Amino acid sequence: MITRMSQLFLRTLRDDPADAEVPSHKLLVRAGYIRRVAPGVYSWLPLGLRVLRNIEAVVREEMNAIGAQEISFPALLPREPYDTTGRWVEYGDALFRLKDRKNADYLLGPTHEEMFTSVVKSEYNSYKDFPVILYQVQTKYRDEERPRAGILRGREFIMKDSYSFNMDDEGLEESYQLHRKAYQNIFDRLGIKYAICSATSGAMGGSASEEFLAVAANGEDTFVRSTESDYAANVEAVVTQVPPAQPIEGQPEAKEYETPDSETIEALVEWANSEGITIDGRAVEAADTLKCIVIKVNDPTLDEEGKPRGESLAGVLVPGNREVDMKRLEASMEPAQVELADEADFKKNPFLVKGYVGPKGLAANGVRVLADPRVVDGTSWITGADAKNRHVVGLVAGRDFTPDGFVEAAEVLEGDPSPDGKGTLALARGIEIGHIFQLGRKYTEAFDVKILDESGKRSVPTMGSYGVGVSRLVGVIAEQMLDDSGLRWPASVAPFDVHVVIANKDAAAGEAAVELVETLSNDGLEVLFDDRPKVSPGVKFKDSELLGMPLVVVVGRGFADGKVELRNRLTGETYEVDYTDALPEAKRALRGEARP
Protein backbone atom coordinates (compact mmCIF):
# COMPACT_ATOMS: atom_id res chain seq x y z
CA MET A 1 0.00 0.00 0.00
CA ILE A 2 1.21 3.51 -0.84
CA THR A 3 0.23 6.63 1.11
CA ARG A 4 1.28 9.98 -0.34
CA MET A 5 2.12 12.70 2.18
CA SER A 6 0.62 15.24 -0.21
CA GLN A 7 -2.74 13.59 0.52
CA LEU A 8 -2.23 12.40 4.11
CA PHE A 9 -4.24 14.09 6.88
CA LEU A 10 -1.20 15.25 8.84
CA ARG A 11 0.16 18.40 10.41
CA THR A 12 3.49 18.22 12.21
CA LEU A 13 4.41 20.80 14.85
CA ARG A 14 7.80 22.33 15.56
CA ASP A 15 7.09 23.27 19.19
CA ASP A 16 6.24 21.04 22.14
CA PRO A 17 2.65 21.25 23.42
CA ALA A 18 2.41 23.30 26.61
CA ASP A 19 0.68 20.55 28.62
CA ALA A 20 3.10 17.73 27.70
CA GLU A 21 5.06 16.25 30.62
CA VAL A 22 7.02 13.36 29.13
CA PRO A 23 8.98 13.02 25.86
CA SER A 24 6.60 10.49 24.28
CA HIS A 25 3.63 12.81 24.81
CA LYS A 26 5.48 15.73 23.23
CA LEU A 27 6.53 13.75 20.17
CA LEU A 28 3.21 11.98 19.58
CA VAL A 29 1.50 15.37 19.48
CA ARG A 30 4.22 17.08 17.44
CA ALA A 31 4.28 14.22 14.92
CA GLY A 32 0.51 14.38 14.45
CA TYR A 33 -0.31 10.97 15.95
CA ILE A 34 -2.74 12.18 18.63
CA ARG A 35 -4.58 15.35 19.62
CA ARG A 36 -5.95 16.35 23.03
CA VAL A 37 -9.73 16.67 23.37
CA ALA A 38 -9.96 17.08 27.17
CA PRO A 39 -7.77 16.19 30.17
CA GLY A 40 -6.92 12.51 29.75
CA VAL A 41 -8.95 12.19 26.53
CA TYR A 42 -7.29 12.02 23.08
CA SER A 43 -8.22 11.63 19.44
CA TRP A 44 -6.28 9.21 17.27
CA LEU A 45 -5.21 10.73 13.95
CA PRO A 46 -4.33 8.51 10.93
CA LEU A 47 -0.71 7.71 11.87
CA GLY A 48 -1.53 7.08 15.53
CA LEU A 49 -4.48 4.90 14.61
CA ARG A 50 -2.28 2.76 12.36
CA VAL A 51 0.12 2.12 15.25
CA LEU A 52 -2.79 1.32 17.55
CA ARG A 53 -4.31 -1.12 15.05
CA ASN A 54 -0.94 -2.85 14.54
CA ILE A 55 -0.59 -3.37 18.28
CA GLU A 56 -4.15 -4.68 18.49
CA ALA A 57 -3.34 -7.17 15.73
CA VAL A 58 -0.37 -8.56 17.70
CA VAL A 59 -2.49 -8.82 20.84
CA ARG A 60 -5.30 -10.62 19.00
CA GLU A 61 -2.90 -13.07 17.35
CA GLU A 62 -1.42 -14.10 20.68
CA MET A 63 -4.80 -14.33 22.41
CA ASN A 64 -6.24 -16.44 19.61
CA ALA A 65 -3.16 -18.68 19.81
CA ILE A 66 -4.09 -19.76 23.36
CA GLY A 67 -7.65 -20.55 22.35
CA ALA A 68 -9.26 -17.34 23.58
CA GLN A 69 -12.41 -16.18 21.78
CA GLU A 70 -13.16 -12.52 21.15
CA ILE A 71 -16.47 -10.93 22.10
CA SER A 72 -17.47 -7.31 22.75
CA PHE A 73 -19.46 -5.74 25.56
CA PRO A 74 -20.85 -2.20 25.64
CA ALA A 75 -18.96 0.53 27.45
CA LEU A 76 -22.24 1.87 28.90
CA LEU A 77 -23.30 -0.51 31.67
CA PRO A 78 -26.13 -0.71 34.23
CA ARG A 79 -25.43 -0.27 37.92
CA GLU A 80 -26.94 -3.55 39.14
CA PRO A 81 -24.09 -5.97 38.30
CA TYR A 82 -21.60 -3.68 40.04
CA ASP A 83 -23.83 -3.52 43.12
CA THR A 84 -23.75 -7.31 43.17
CA THR A 85 -19.97 -7.30 43.61
CA GLY A 86 -19.81 -4.12 45.71
CA ARG A 87 -17.65 -2.34 43.17
CA TRP A 88 -20.20 0.43 42.54
CA VAL A 89 -19.02 1.70 45.95
CA GLU A 90 -15.47 0.31 46.01
CA TYR A 91 -14.38 2.14 42.87
CA GLY A 92 -15.19 5.44 44.57
CA ASP A 93 -14.56 8.61 42.59
CA ALA A 94 -12.70 6.73 39.84
CA LEU A 95 -16.01 5.54 38.39
CA PHE A 96 -17.82 7.58 35.73
CA ARG A 97 -21.47 7.50 36.86
CA LEU A 98 -24.47 8.80 34.94
CA LYS A 99 -28.26 8.61 34.85
CA ASP A 100 -30.64 8.11 31.96
CA ARG A 101 -33.86 10.08 31.42
CA LYS A 102 -35.71 7.64 33.69
CA ASN A 103 -33.22 8.33 36.50
CA ALA A 104 -31.70 4.84 36.30
CA ASP A 105 -28.00 4.58 37.27
CA TYR A 106 -25.37 3.64 34.69
CA LEU A 107 -21.60 3.68 34.52
CA LEU A 108 -18.88 3.79 31.90
CA GLY A 109 -17.06 0.49 32.26
CA PRO A 110 -13.66 0.61 34.01
CA THR A 111 -13.35 -3.16 33.63
CA HIS A 112 -15.81 -5.93 32.79
CA GLU A 113 -15.54 -8.85 35.24
CA GLU A 114 -19.22 -8.57 36.09
CA MET A 115 -20.32 -8.72 32.47
CA PHE A 116 -18.12 -11.69 31.55
CA THR A 117 -19.33 -13.59 34.61
CA SER A 118 -22.95 -12.86 33.75
CA VAL A 119 -22.64 -13.99 30.14
CA VAL A 120 -20.96 -17.27 31.09
CA LYS A 121 -23.71 -17.91 33.65
CA SER A 122 -26.40 -17.29 31.05
CA GLU A 123 -24.83 -19.45 28.32
CA TYR A 124 -23.09 -22.40 30.05
CA ASN A 125 -24.28 -24.88 32.67
CA SER A 126 -22.16 -28.04 32.31
CA TYR A 127 -18.53 -28.93 33.02
CA LYS A 128 -18.38 -30.12 29.41
CA ASP A 129 -18.43 -26.46 28.33
CA PHE A 130 -15.26 -25.69 30.28
CA PRO A 131 -12.56 -24.43 30.27
CA VAL A 132 -13.33 -21.26 28.36
CA ILE A 133 -11.33 -18.07 27.74
CA LEU A 134 -13.10 -14.96 26.45
CA TYR A 135 -11.58 -11.59 25.62
CA GLN A 136 -12.39 -8.19 24.20
CA VAL A 137 -10.49 -5.13 22.99
CA GLN A 138 -12.64 -2.34 24.34
CA THR A 139 -12.62 1.31 25.40
CA LYS A 140 -12.51 1.76 29.19
CA TYR A 141 -13.17 4.75 31.40
CA ARG A 142 -11.69 5.78 34.75
CA ASP A 143 -12.04 9.23 36.23
CA GLU A 144 -8.37 9.68 37.10
CA GLU A 145 -7.82 12.47 39.60
CA ARG A 146 -4.66 13.57 37.79
CA PRO A 147 -4.54 12.33 34.19
CA ARG A 148 -0.99 12.81 32.98
CA ALA A 149 1.65 11.91 30.42
CA GLY A 150 -0.75 11.92 27.48
CA ILE A 151 -2.01 8.44 26.63
CA LEU A 152 0.10 6.85 29.38
CA ARG A 153 -2.43 7.85 32.05
CA GLY A 154 -5.75 8.78 30.51
CA ARG A 155 -9.39 8.79 31.52
CA GLU A 156 -10.45 7.03 28.31
CA PHE A 157 -8.23 4.22 27.06
CA ILE A 158 -8.28 0.99 25.10
CA MET A 159 -7.65 -2.26 26.92
CA LYS A 160 -7.59 -5.92 26.11
CA ASP A 161 -9.24 -7.76 28.96
CA SER A 162 -9.66 -11.51 29.00
CA TYR A 163 -11.21 -13.90 31.50
CA SER A 164 -10.71 -17.58 32.04
CA PHE A 165 -13.32 -19.88 33.59
CA ASN A 166 -12.23 -23.26 34.96
CA MET A 167 -13.88 -25.92 37.08
CA ASP A 168 -10.95 -26.22 39.50
CA ASP A 169 -7.84 -24.42 40.75
CA GLU A 170 -5.51 -26.59 38.69
CA GLY A 171 -7.30 -25.45 35.56
CA LEU A 172 -7.05 -21.83 36.69
CA GLU A 173 -3.30 -22.21 37.09
CA GLU A 174 -3.05 -23.56 33.53
CA SER A 175 -5.06 -20.62 32.15
CA TYR A 176 -2.96 -18.20 34.17
CA GLN A 177 0.28 -19.63 32.79
CA LEU A 178 -1.11 -19.55 29.23
CA HIS A 179 -1.76 -15.84 29.62
CA ARG A 180 1.59 -15.23 31.26
CA LYS A 181 3.37 -16.74 28.26
CA ALA A 182 1.07 -14.97 25.78
CA TYR A 183 1.90 -11.64 27.40
CA GLN A 184 5.61 -12.36 27.17
CA ASN A 185 5.13 -13.12 23.47
CA ILE A 186 3.20 -9.88 22.94
CA PHE A 187 5.72 -7.65 24.64
CA ASP A 188 8.69 -9.44 23.05
CA ARG A 189 7.16 -8.97 19.59
CA LEU A 190 6.62 -5.29 20.31
CA GLY A 191 10.25 -4.87 21.35
CA ILE A 192 9.43 -3.64 24.86
CA LYS A 193 11.88 -3.88 27.76
CA TYR A 194 9.82 -5.09 30.71
CA ALA A 195 9.88 -6.84 34.07
CA ILE A 196 7.35 -9.31 35.53
CA CYS A 197 6.61 -8.30 39.11
CA SER A 198 4.55 -9.66 41.97
CA ALA A 199 1.66 -7.29 42.59
CA THR A 200 -1.41 -6.57 44.68
CA SER A 201 -4.92 -7.23 43.41
CA GLY A 202 -6.59 -4.00 44.55
CA ALA A 203 -10.28 -3.61 43.77
CA MET A 204 -10.06 -6.62 41.44
CA GLY A 205 -9.85 -9.04 44.34
CA GLY A 206 -8.39 -12.52 44.11
CA SER A 207 -5.10 -14.05 45.15
CA ALA A 208 -2.10 -14.47 42.84
CA SER A 209 -1.31 -11.36 40.84
CA GLU A 210 1.56 -10.22 38.62
CA GLU A 211 2.25 -6.99 36.77
CA PHE A 212 4.18 -6.49 33.57
CA LEU A 213 6.06 -3.20 33.92
CA ALA A 214 7.79 -1.47 31.02
CA VAL A 215 11.10 -0.09 32.24
CA ALA A 216 10.96 3.73 32.06
CA ALA A 217 12.86 6.34 34.04
CA ASN A 218 9.75 8.52 34.27
CA GLY A 219 7.35 5.66 35.01
CA GLU A 220 4.85 6.27 37.80
CA ASP A 221 5.29 2.81 39.34
CA THR A 222 8.27 1.87 41.46
CA PHE A 223 9.37 -1.74 41.42
CA VAL A 224 12.22 -3.68 42.96
CA ARG A 225 14.52 -6.47 41.88
CA SER A 226 16.75 -8.63 44.01
CA THR A 227 20.47 -8.33 43.40
CA GLU A 228 20.91 -12.10 43.79
CA SER A 229 17.71 -13.78 42.54
CA ASP A 230 14.81 -13.51 40.10
CA TYR A 231 12.60 -11.83 42.69
CA ALA A 232 10.82 -8.75 41.35
CA ALA A 233 7.78 -6.95 42.70
CA ASN A 234 5.81 -3.79 42.42
CA VAL A 235 6.77 -1.73 45.45
CA GLU A 236 3.15 -1.98 46.67
CA ALA A 237 3.52 -5.77 46.92
CA VAL A 238 6.85 -5.89 48.76
CA VAL A 239 6.44 -7.71 52.05
CA THR A 240 8.67 -6.46 54.86
CA GLN A 241 10.95 -9.00 56.48
CA VAL A 242 9.77 -9.14 60.09
CA PRO A 243 12.64 -9.06 62.60
CA PRO A 244 12.49 -11.35 65.65
CA ALA A 245 10.82 -10.03 68.79
CA GLN A 246 13.16 -8.62 71.43
CA PRO A 247 13.12 -9.38 75.16
CA ILE A 248 11.09 -6.82 77.09
CA GLU A 249 12.27 -7.70 80.57
CA GLY A 250 15.12 -5.54 81.78
CA GLN A 251 14.52 -2.65 79.43
CA PRO A 252 14.54 0.77 81.15
CA GLU A 253 11.27 2.54 81.75
CA ALA A 254 10.10 5.01 79.15
CA LYS A 255 11.01 8.60 80.01
CA GLU A 256 9.38 11.81 78.81
CA TYR A 257 11.56 14.79 77.85
CA GLU A 258 11.13 18.44 76.99
CA THR A 259 12.10 18.66 73.31
CA PRO A 260 11.68 22.27 72.15
CA ASP A 261 11.13 22.90 68.42
CA SER A 262 11.57 19.24 67.46
CA GLU A 263 8.59 18.63 65.20
CA THR A 264 10.72 16.93 62.51
CA ILE A 265 12.68 13.70 62.72
CA GLU A 266 15.87 15.58 61.84
CA ALA A 267 15.36 18.01 64.72
CA LEU A 268 14.46 15.18 67.11
CA VAL A 269 17.64 13.23 66.29
CA GLU A 270 19.72 16.39 66.70
CA TRP A 271 18.14 17.02 70.10
CA ALA A 272 18.68 13.43 71.29
CA ASN A 273 22.35 13.47 70.39
CA SER A 274 22.85 16.90 71.96
CA GLU A 275 21.43 15.45 75.20
CA GLY A 276 23.85 12.52 75.10
CA ILE A 277 21.12 9.92 74.65
CA THR A 278 22.51 6.70 73.18
CA ILE A 279 21.09 3.49 71.75
CA ASP A 280 23.17 0.42 72.60
CA GLY A 281 26.16 2.69 73.11
CA ARG A 282 25.87 4.56 69.79
CA ALA A 283 24.45 7.86 68.66
CA VAL A 284 20.74 8.11 67.93
CA GLU A 285 19.72 7.71 64.27
CA ALA A 286 16.48 8.44 62.44
CA ALA A 287 15.72 4.69 62.38
CA ASP A 288 15.51 4.76 66.20
CA THR A 289 12.58 7.15 66.11
CA LEU A 290 8.97 6.31 65.37
CA LYS A 291 6.84 8.52 63.13
CA CYS A 292 3.14 8.56 63.83
CA ILE A 293 1.20 9.69 60.76
CA VAL A 294 -2.50 10.42 61.18
CA ILE A 295 -4.74 9.40 58.28
CA LYS A 296 -8.43 9.44 57.41
CA VAL A 297 -9.90 6.10 56.37
CA ASN A 298 -13.13 5.84 54.39
CA ASP A 299 -14.17 2.19 54.59
CA PRO A 300 -17.00 1.13 52.23
CA THR A 301 -17.29 -2.37 53.68
CA LEU A 302 -20.40 -3.14 55.70
CA ASP A 303 -20.60 -3.62 59.45
CA GLU A 304 -22.75 -6.14 61.33
CA GLU A 305 -25.83 -3.99 60.72
CA GLY A 306 -25.20 -3.84 56.98
CA LYS A 307 -24.09 -0.20 57.00
CA PRO A 308 -20.85 1.17 55.48
CA ARG A 309 -18.22 1.66 58.16
CA GLY A 310 -17.51 5.09 56.74
CA GLU A 311 -14.86 7.58 57.80
CA SER A 312 -12.56 7.29 60.80
CA LEU A 313 -9.08 8.31 61.92
CA ALA A 314 -6.11 5.97 62.23
CA GLY A 315 -2.47 6.33 63.16
CA VAL A 316 0.28 4.75 61.06
CA LEU A 317 3.61 4.03 62.76
CA VAL A 318 6.77 3.82 60.63
CA PRO A 319 10.47 4.03 61.51
CA GLY A 320 11.68 7.63 61.32
CA ASN A 321 14.17 6.97 58.52
CA ARG A 322 11.30 6.13 56.15
CA GLU A 323 8.48 8.12 54.62
CA VAL A 324 4.94 6.77 54.38
CA ASP A 325 4.43 5.49 50.84
CA MET A 326 0.80 6.36 50.08
CA LYS A 327 0.57 3.79 47.29
CA ARG A 328 1.70 1.01 49.62
CA LEU A 329 -0.65 2.26 52.30
CA GLU A 330 -3.59 2.44 49.88
CA ALA A 331 -2.87 -1.09 48.63
CA SER A 332 -2.73 -2.40 52.20
CA MET A 333 -5.99 -0.70 53.15
CA GLU A 334 -8.06 -1.78 50.09
CA PRO A 335 -10.96 -1.40 49.56
CA ALA A 336 -10.88 1.56 51.97
CA GLN A 337 -9.75 4.93 50.65
CA VAL A 338 -7.13 6.80 52.67
CA GLU A 339 -5.74 10.31 52.83
CA LEU A 340 -3.59 12.28 55.24
CA ALA A 341 -5.39 14.11 58.03
CA ASP A 342 -5.62 17.84 57.36
CA GLU A 343 -5.66 20.97 59.53
CA ALA A 344 -9.40 20.66 60.10
CA ASP A 345 -8.94 17.15 61.51
CA PHE A 346 -6.28 18.35 63.95
CA LYS A 347 -8.49 21.23 65.10
CA LYS A 348 -11.47 18.91 65.53
CA ASN A 349 -9.38 16.50 67.65
CA PRO A 350 -7.28 18.52 70.13
CA PHE A 351 -5.53 15.40 71.41
CA LEU A 352 -3.71 15.38 68.07
CA VAL A 353 -0.65 17.60 68.52
CA LYS A 354 1.07 18.08 65.18
CA GLY A 355 4.68 16.94 65.28
CA TYR A 356 4.25 15.23 68.64
CA VAL A 357 1.61 12.53 68.05
CA GLY A 358 2.38 9.20 69.71
CA PRO A 359 0.73 5.77 69.86
CA LYS A 360 -0.33 6.07 73.50
CA GLY A 361 -2.40 9.21 72.94
CA LEU A 362 -4.09 7.69 69.91
CA ALA A 363 -5.02 4.50 71.74
CA ALA A 364 -6.31 6.47 74.74
CA ASN A 365 -8.69 8.34 72.43
CA GLY A 366 -9.99 5.29 70.60
CA VAL A 367 -7.99 5.84 67.41
CA ARG A 368 -6.86 2.67 65.70
CA VAL A 369 -3.05 2.27 65.60
CA LEU A 370 -1.47 0.43 62.65
CA ALA A 371 2.25 -0.29 62.76
CA ASP A 372 5.02 -1.14 60.35
CA PRO A 373 5.94 -4.86 60.64
CA ARG A 374 9.34 -3.84 62.06
CA VAL A 375 7.61 -2.57 65.20
CA VAL A 376 7.76 -5.95 66.93
CA ASP A 377 7.45 -6.62 70.63
CA GLY A 378 10.51 -5.50 72.55
CA THR A 379 11.62 -2.83 70.10
CA SER A 380 12.29 0.50 71.81
CA TRP A 381 11.50 3.85 70.20
CA ILE A 382 11.74 7.61 70.55
CA THR A 383 8.37 9.06 69.62
CA GLY A 384 5.83 11.77 70.34
CA ALA A 385 4.45 12.23 73.85
CA ASP A 386 1.15 13.79 72.67
CA ALA A 387 2.06 17.23 74.02
CA LYS A 388 3.77 20.17 72.33
CA ASN A 389 7.56 20.13 72.63
CA ARG A 390 7.57 16.75 74.36
CA HIS A 391 8.81 13.31 73.26
CA VAL A 392 9.19 10.01 75.04
CA VAL A 393 12.39 7.95 74.93
CA GLY A 394 12.38 4.18 75.39
CA LEU A 395 8.74 3.49 74.50
CA VAL A 396 8.68 -0.29 74.12
CA ALA A 397 6.28 -2.12 71.82
CA GLY A 398 4.35 -4.82 73.65
CA ARG A 399 4.90 -3.12 76.99
CA ASP A 400 4.01 0.55 76.65
CA PHE A 401 1.81 0.28 73.58
CA THR A 402 0.31 -2.45 71.43
CA PRO A 403 -0.65 -1.81 67.79
CA ASP A 404 -4.16 -2.78 66.70
CA GLY A 405 -2.68 -4.26 63.54
CA PHE A 406 0.15 -4.07 61.06
CA VAL A 407 0.27 -2.38 57.67
CA GLU A 408 2.74 -2.19 54.78
CA ALA A 409 3.03 1.59 54.55
CA ALA A 410 6.72 2.47 54.89
CA GLU A 411 8.67 3.29 51.75
CA VAL A 412 10.97 0.59 50.40
CA LEU A 413 14.59 1.71 50.34
CA GLU A 414 17.46 0.74 48.06
CA GLY A 415 19.44 -1.98 49.82
CA ASP A 416 16.56 -3.37 51.91
CA PRO A 417 16.70 -7.16 52.35
CA SER A 418 14.96 -9.05 49.56
CA PRO A 419 11.77 -10.75 50.81
CA ASP A 420 12.98 -14.08 49.38
CA GLY A 421 16.06 -13.91 51.62
CA LYS A 422 18.46 -13.61 48.69
CA GLY A 423 20.41 -10.40 48.29
CA THR A 424 19.13 -6.87 48.62
CA LEU A 425 16.62 -4.80 46.67
CA ALA A 426 17.41 -2.42 43.83
CA LEU A 427 14.78 0.19 42.90
CA ALA A 428 13.62 0.96 39.35
CA ARG A 429 10.77 2.83 37.68
CA GLY A 430 8.22 1.40 35.27
CA ILE A 431 4.89 1.79 33.50
CA GLU A 432 2.25 -0.90 33.95
CA ILE A 433 1.42 -2.49 30.59
CA GLY A 434 -0.20 -5.74 31.71
CA HIS A 435 -1.69 -7.32 34.81
CA ILE A 436 -2.78 -10.91 35.41
CA PHE A 437 -4.89 -12.10 38.35
CA GLN A 438 -6.06 -15.39 39.74
CA LEU A 439 -9.44 -14.09 40.86
CA GLY A 440 -10.72 -17.34 42.27
CA ARG A 441 -14.46 -17.47 42.96
CA LYS A 442 -15.13 -13.89 44.09
CA TYR A 443 -17.24 -13.01 41.06
CA THR A 444 -18.75 -16.40 40.27
CA GLU A 445 -19.96 -16.68 43.88
CA ALA A 446 -21.31 -13.13 43.82
CA PHE A 447 -23.38 -13.99 40.74
CA ASP A 448 -24.28 -17.46 42.05
CA VAL A 449 -22.79 -19.23 39.03
CA LYS A 450 -23.39 -22.96 39.52
CA ILE A 451 -22.12 -25.48 36.95
CA LEU A 452 -22.96 -29.18 36.87
CA ASP A 453 -19.65 -30.99 37.52
CA GLU A 454 -18.56 -34.53 36.63
CA SER A 455 -20.04 -35.94 39.84
CA GLY A 456 -23.45 -34.46 39.07
CA LYS A 457 -23.17 -31.74 41.72
CA ARG A 458 -23.43 -28.01 41.25
CA SER A 459 -20.00 -26.36 41.55
CA VAL A 460 -18.80 -22.77 41.38
CA PRO A 461 -16.18 -22.24 38.64
CA THR A 462 -13.02 -20.27 39.29
CA MET A 463 -11.87 -17.24 37.31
CA GLY A 464 -8.77 -15.48 36.06
CA SER A 465 -8.61 -11.89 34.82
CA TYR A 466 -5.94 -10.61 32.45
CA GLY A 467 -5.47 -7.08 31.11
CA VAL A 468 -3.21 -5.33 28.60
CA GLY A 469 -3.21 -1.56 28.19
CA VAL A 470 -3.38 -1.49 24.40
CA SER A 471 -3.50 2.28 23.86
CA ARG A 472 -0.93 2.78 26.61
CA LEU A 473 1.46 0.54 24.67
CA VAL A 474 1.62 3.19 21.94
CA GLY A 475 3.00 5.65 24.47
CA VAL A 476 5.27 3.07 26.09
CA ILE A 477 6.91 2.05 22.81
CA ALA A 478 7.33 5.71 21.89
CA GLU A 479 8.86 6.43 25.30
CA GLN A 480 11.34 3.55 25.18
CA MET A 481 12.37 3.96 21.54
CA LEU A 482 12.50 7.73 20.89
CA ASP A 483 15.73 9.66 20.37
CA ASP A 484 16.72 13.32 20.13
CA SER A 485 15.36 13.56 16.58
CA GLY A 486 11.92 12.07 17.08
CA LEU A 487 9.95 8.84 17.28
CA ARG A 488 11.37 5.45 16.30
CA TRP A 489 8.91 2.64 15.67
CA PRO A 490 9.86 -1.05 15.49
CA ALA A 491 8.73 -2.73 12.28
CA SER A 492 6.08 -4.74 14.16
CA VAL A 493 3.99 -1.63 14.93
CA ALA A 494 5.22 1.17 12.64
CA PRO A 495 2.51 2.98 10.64
CA PHE A 496 4.57 2.25 7.51
CA ASP A 497 7.52 0.01 6.82
CA VAL A 498 9.39 2.46 4.61
CA HIS A 499 9.36 6.24 4.27
CA VAL A 500 10.50 7.29 0.78
CA VAL A 501 11.66 10.89 0.39
CA ILE A 502 12.22 12.73 -2.91
CA ALA A 503 15.10 15.17 -2.35
CA ASN A 504 15.99 15.80 -5.98
CA LYS A 505 14.10 18.14 -8.32
CA ASP A 506 15.28 16.27 -11.39
CA ALA A 507 12.32 14.80 -13.30
CA ALA A 508 14.11 11.49 -13.81
CA ALA A 509 14.72 11.21 -10.06
CA GLY A 510 11.04 11.87 -9.42
CA GLU A 511 10.00 9.17 -11.86
CA ALA A 512 12.49 6.75 -10.33
CA ALA A 513 11.12 7.48 -6.85
CA VAL A 514 7.59 6.69 -8.01
CA GLU A 515 8.81 3.45 -9.58
CA LEU A 516 10.70 2.53 -6.40
CA VAL A 517 7.63 3.18 -4.26
CA GLU A 518 5.53 0.92 -6.49
CA THR A 519 8.21 -1.80 -6.38
CA LEU A 520 8.31 -1.72 -2.57
CA SER A 521 4.51 -1.73 -2.35
CA ASN A 522 4.12 -4.58 -4.83
CA ASP A 523 6.40 -6.66 -2.62
CA GLY A 524 4.01 -6.23 0.31
CA LEU A 525 5.62 -3.30 2.11
CA GLU A 526 3.59 -0.40 3.50
CA VAL A 527 5.12 2.77 2.04
CA LEU A 528 4.82 6.41 3.09
CA PHE A 529 5.81 8.53 0.09
CA ASP A 530 6.88 12.13 0.71
CA ASP A 531 5.95 13.57 -2.66
CA ARG A 532 5.20 17.10 -1.42
CA PRO A 533 6.36 19.36 -4.28
CA LYS A 534 6.76 22.65 -2.40
CA VAL A 535 8.51 21.34 0.70
CA SER A 536 12.30 21.62 1.00
CA PRO A 537 14.50 18.53 1.46
CA GLY A 538 15.50 19.82 4.91
CA VAL A 539 11.90 19.91 6.11
CA LYS A 540 11.24 16.48 4.60
CA PHE A 541 14.25 15.04 6.42
CA LYS A 542 13.15 16.61 9.73
CA ASP A 543 9.67 15.16 9.28
CA SER A 544 11.04 11.72 8.43
CA GLU A 545 13.00 11.71 11.70
CA LEU A 546 10.07 13.03 13.71
CA LEU A 547 7.55 10.51 12.29
CA GLY A 548 9.85 7.59 13.05
CA MET A 549 9.32 4.94 10.35
CA PRO A 550 11.96 2.24 10.80
CA LEU A 551 13.54 2.84 7.38
CA VAL A 552 13.87 6.00 5.29
CA VAL A 553 14.89 5.77 1.62
CA VAL A 554 16.10 9.03 0.08
CA VAL A 555 16.13 9.59 -3.66
CA GLY A 556 18.50 12.54 -3.70
CA ARG A 557 21.72 13.80 -5.24
CA GLY A 558 23.21 10.33 -5.37
CA PHE A 559 20.61 9.27 -7.92
CA ALA A 560 22.79 10.80 -10.65
CA ASP A 561 25.20 7.92 -9.92
CA GLY A 562 22.41 5.33 -9.65
CA LYS A 563 22.40 5.42 -5.83
CA VAL A 564 19.76 5.91 -3.16
CA GLU A 565 20.38 6.53 0.53
CA LEU A 566 19.01 4.30 3.28
CA ARG A 567 18.58 5.69 6.78
CA ASN A 568 17.86 3.14 9.50
CA ARG A 569 16.06 4.99 12.30
CA LEU A 570 16.50 2.11 14.75
CA THR A 571 20.25 1.60 14.37
CA GLY A 572 21.23 5.08 13.21
CA GLU A 573 23.02 3.69 10.15
CA THR A 574 23.07 5.76 6.94
CA TYR A 575 24.50 4.32 3.73
CA GLU A 576 24.08 4.29 -0.04
CA VAL A 577 23.04 1.33 -2.16
CA ASP A 578 22.42 0.86 -5.85
CA TYR A 579 18.95 1.92 -6.87
CA THR A 580 18.30 -1.62 -8.15
CA ASP A 581 19.23 -3.07 -4.73
CA ALA A 582 16.88 -0.85 -2.74
CA LEU A 583 14.17 -3.51 -2.32
CA PRO A 584 16.33 -6.37 -1.01
CA GLU A 585 18.30 -3.94 1.19
CA ALA A 586 15.08 -2.52 2.63
CA LYS A 587 13.73 -5.99 3.42
CA ARG A 588 17.02 -7.01 5.04
CA ALA A 589 17.05 -3.89 7.20
CA LEU A 590 13.43 -4.40 8.25
CA ARG A 591 14.23 -7.97 9.31
CA GLY A 592 16.93 -6.53 11.57
CA GLU A 593 19.74 -8.35 9.78
CA ALA A 594 23.24 -6.89 9.75
CA ARG A 595 24.69 -5.62 6.49
CA PRO A 596 26.94 -8.18 4.74
From Swiss-Prot:
**An annotated GO cellular component:** cytosol
Its localization reads:
Cytoplasm
Q: Which InterPro entries match?
A: aa-tRNA-synt_IIb, aa-tRNA-synth_II, aa-tRNA-synth_II/BPL/LPL, Anticodon-bd, Anticodon-bd_dom_sf, Pro-tRNA-ligase_IIa, Pro-tRNA-synth_IIa_bac-type, Pro-tRNA-Synthase_IIa_type1
Q: Which parts form a coiled-coil structure per UniProt? A: none
- GO BP: any one term: prolyl-tRNA aminoacylation
Q: Which Pfam families match?
A: HGTP_anticodon, tRNA-synt_2b, tRNA_edit
Instruction: Note the superkingdom of the native organism.
Output: Bacteria
Repeat keyword on record: no
Q: Which SUPFAM superfamilies match?
A: Class II aaRS ABD-related (SSF52954), Class II aaRS and biotin synthetases (SSF55681), YbaK/ProRS associated domain (SSF55826)
Q: Does the keyword ATP-binding apply?
A: yes
Listed A to Z, the keywords are:
Aminoacyl-tRNA synthetase, ATP-binding, Cytoplasm, Ligase, Nucleotide-binding, Protein biosynthesis
Q: Which CDD domains match?
A: ProRS_anticodon_short, ProRS_core_prok
- EC number assigned by the record: 6.1.1.15
Molecular function terms, GO-annotated: aminoacyl-tRNA deacylase activity; ATP binding; proline-tRNA ligase activity
Q: Which reaction does it catalyse?
A: tRNA(Pro) + L-proline + ATP = L-prolyl-tRNA(Pro) + AMP + diphosphate
Mind telling me which HAMAP family this protein's record contains?
A: Pro_tRNA_synth_type1
Q: Subunit arrangement?
A: Homodimer.
What the protein does comes down to: Catalyzes the attachment of proline to tRNA(Pro) in a two-step reaction: proline is first activated by ATP to form Pro-AMP and then transferred to the acceptor end of tRNA(Pro). As ProRS can inadvertently accommodate and process non-cognate amino acids such as alanine and cysteine, to avoid such errors it has two additional distinct editing activities against alanine. One activity is designated as 'pretransfer' editing and involves the tRNA(Pro)-independent hydrolysis of activated Ala-AMP.
PANTHER family, alphabetically?
Answer: MITOCHONDRIAL RIBOSOME PROTEIN L39/PROLYL-TRNA LIGASE FAMILY MEMBER, PROLINE--TRNA LIGASE
Q: What is known of its domains?
A: Consists of three domains: the N-terminal catalytic domain, the editing domain and the C-terminal anticodon-binding domain.
Q: State the protein's name.
A: Proline--tRNA ligase
Q: Which gene encodes it?
A: proS
